[in-house]
Amino acid sequence: MVNAIEMAIDERGGKAGNVNIEYESQDSATAQAGQWDEAKCAENAQTAAQDEEIVGWIGPFNSGCAVVEIPILNEAGLGMISPANTYIGLTKPGGEPDEPEKYYPTGERNYTRVIVADDEQGQAGALLMEEKGVESVYILDDKETYGKGLADQVQQSADELGIQVIGREGVDTTAANFRSVMNKIAQEDPDAIYFGGIIENNAAQLVKDKLGAGMSNDDILFIGPDGIFLDEFLSQGGEAAEGAYITFGGLPESELSSKGKQFVQEYESRYDDEVQPYTAYAYEAANVMLDAIERASKDGEVTRETVLKEIFATEDYNGLLGTWSFDEDGDTTLTELSVQQVENGEFEYQRTIDAGEM
């Protein structure tokens, strides 16, 4: 995502209008945690809040990190645009009690996202099950904000579609393996297993132990969310990942607009690297932020307050993802999600689901 953000800035000559732009990336992960770290997220947000020269925040990547950062940056009046957060409770009811209000201590919104939220991804996951003839499902999650929240949405949508949820539990992601869990599930003989979580929490080991328990993806589907829509799932999962279905709260590179396809070509030429699912979304978020800064500069002084106002004023934005706006909650008006399946060690696009029509 960092490359995509830097590319957006470089293409404008390091400026937003007549304003010189400086960008500094902040890693929310630590070597000790091996993934995003709550204390590091808080530290990053506090550092930004105290630096008056910072007028905008692109991120974070993980929804759990957003839970920590939003209140800190809200009190600082710093506008946020996330390329990747999908947890429903960050912007609207449907998650835990007092959400989303508890993330906005000032009573004013400062957070936006350019990707579809998990209430719609949960519906897409359940709809996929229905289309595949699934009558029963066992739902697992990694006990984190994103994973548990998404699993909750899938369970709710499955219930509404008449799909029997025969088991639901959070797994110990620090365990060396999940053999006991998978052996137990095998006795229940569901039509599908759904996992709400991220690749860093041993999603690949789950599919390995699923196969080891005699549950092939031909007989018992494995369905996961965009938290495992990463190359690591393919490389770590190997043969066990074959046939797995993945939902994504957006569109893969092959289904982007003509602008999106042009971006992919230019990005891969520039960095000699393939785009990842969130690369285009990071580029979109960066350009929206730069546009907000430019509009603020034309109206007067560029401050956190004026940039935040212009972020929320984003309307009919014609970008890589199509034409869209931010609603009053900070959510994108985009409604398209996608389904991928692992085939021959690659994610292969299957279809687009329009949440607005579900």
Describe the residue ranges of each PLM region.
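Short, well-structured alpha-helical segments in soluble
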Residues: 34-55, 127, 177-189
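Signal peptide-proximal N-terminal region
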Residues: 2-28, 159-163
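Extracellular/periplasmic periplasmic-binding protein-like sensory domains
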Residues: 207-283, 297, 347-349, 353-358
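Extracytoplasmic ligand/sensor domains, especially the bilobed periplasmic-binding protein
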Residues: 51-168, 221-243
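Segments of small-molecule ligand-sensing domains
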Residues: 269-279, 290-347
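Hydrophobic alpha-helical
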Residues: 63-74, 176, 190-214
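Surface-exposed patches in mature extracellular/periplasmic domains of secreted proteins
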Residues: 17-25, 56-61, 138-142, 196, ...
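Short beta->alpha junction loops
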Residues: 25-38, 44, 116, 167-177
